[in-house]
């Protein structure tokens, strides 16, 4: 029996009826964030029969709690990770071309307060341009003090020497995730949210599906597949551990979770269409102040987090850190009372071998 489905149907009964059919999928994906949804689109576009299960809303976790940037990794360039920067720049181009309604170029300005800052950082950003090649969004430009102030009118003026302007991208993370979900559904994939995978199924010592549960009714379903993809982000080790226990094999954690806090303040702190880049914070990271929907996003942090909360909360010291670091570059320092919103994204960083995962700032952002 075949049940027709419109793209990303909201008819719960129809979705569950499809889920209950005795079907063996080519690919079963656990997790409806950017990775899971992207995998679903790729697989179904190649003709595979795909089912995706999500325990909450699509893009509930990290995939809707980003800094809203499509960047090639300026910080990674400073670390000498050229291959990662080149890959990120390629992906930036792909996203800008594929979703121009959700992703656009964004100019950034890095103010300089020491005489050598402009040539030092400018040279690095020129290399950024070179790595982007024909896919560059605009040329890096060395700025005078006056032009820096025209582009960033609220930046701190004392000891300001000039600045550097470069280009990267900005996107709507949550809308992109939903666009991926709709695309996958339109091509025939079955996507069901609020239906968490509860346990893995095994056949001949290999994972062959999951038992999932409708969060509304508690009804359980067995879903079988030739291949199961664990795309649960920071929670990936929970299923890996379950699989290991079932097979009686030890397994080491793969992920070192890290949280990134974002603070939103009013646009008056940065009344411009240019983003501000703080090249080096007290903990050695970069910090962004990014215009977004009439407000300004300040962030982010990199703090190890092991409790894997579904609704991670910012530590007060993280909020104060962001406000202080941003305030060092603004003529008016934002205070705790100026904060309009806060969100936290969890990074599923791949833990290096023989590493306790406590210094997440140094963990590579490359995939394994």
Give, region by region, the residue ranges found by the protein language model.
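Flavin (primarily FAD) binding-site architecture
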Residues: 230-247
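Glycine-rich FAD pyrophosphate-binding loop
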Residues: 44-65
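Extreme N-terminal leader/targeting segments of oxidoreductases
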Residues: 1-27, 42-46
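C-terminal catalytic lobe of FAD-dependent flavoproteins
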Residues: 175, 183, 244-368
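Short hydrophobic core segments
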Residues: 29-30, 223-233
């Amino acid at each position: 029996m075949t049940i027709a489905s419109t793209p990303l149907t909201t008819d719960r009964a129809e979705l569950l009826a499809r889920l209950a059919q005795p079907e063996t999928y080519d690919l079963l994906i656990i997790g409806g964030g950017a990775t899971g949804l992207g995998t679903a689109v790729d697989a179904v576009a190649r003709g595979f029969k795909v089912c995706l299960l999500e325990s909450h809303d699509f893009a509930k976790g990290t995939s809707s709690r980003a800094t809203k940037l499509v960047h090639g990794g300026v910080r990674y360039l400073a670390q000498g990770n050229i291959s990662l920067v080149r890959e990120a720049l390629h992906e930036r181009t792909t996203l800008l071309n594929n979703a121009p309604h959700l992703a656009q170029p964004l100019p950034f300005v890095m103010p300089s307060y020491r005489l050598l800052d402009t040539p030092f950082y400018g040279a690095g950003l020129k290399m950024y341009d070179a790595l982007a090649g024909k896919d560059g969004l605009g040329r890096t430009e060395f700025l005078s003090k006056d032009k820096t102030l025209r582009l960033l009118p609220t930046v701190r003026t004392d000891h300001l020497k000039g600045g550097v302007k470069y280009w990267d991208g900005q996107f709507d993370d949550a809308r992109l995730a939903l666009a991926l979900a709709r695309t996958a559904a339109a091509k025939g994939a079955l996507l069901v949210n609020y239906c968490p995978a509860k346990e893995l199924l095994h056949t001949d010592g290999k994972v062959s599906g999951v038992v999932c549960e409708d969060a509304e009714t508690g009804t359980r379903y067995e879903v079988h597949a030739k291949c199961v993809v664990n795309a649960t982000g920071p929670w990936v080790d929970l299923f890996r551990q379950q699989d290991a226990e079932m097979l009686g094999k030890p397994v080491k954690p793969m992920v070192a979770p890290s949280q990134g806090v974002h603070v939103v303040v009013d646009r008056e702190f940065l009344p411009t269409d240019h983003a501000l880049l703080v090249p080096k914070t007290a903990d050695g990271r970069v910090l962004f102040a990014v215009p977004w929907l009439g407000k300004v996003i300040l962030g982010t942090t990199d703090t190890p987090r092991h409790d894997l909360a579904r609704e991670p909360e910012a530590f007060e010291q993280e909020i104060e850190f962001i406000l202080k670091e941003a305030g060092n570059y603004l003529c008016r320092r934002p205070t705790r009372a100026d904060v309009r919103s806060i969100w936290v994204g969890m990074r599923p960083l791949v833990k290096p071998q023989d590493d306790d995962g406590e210094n997440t700032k140094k963990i590579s952002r490359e995939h394994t």
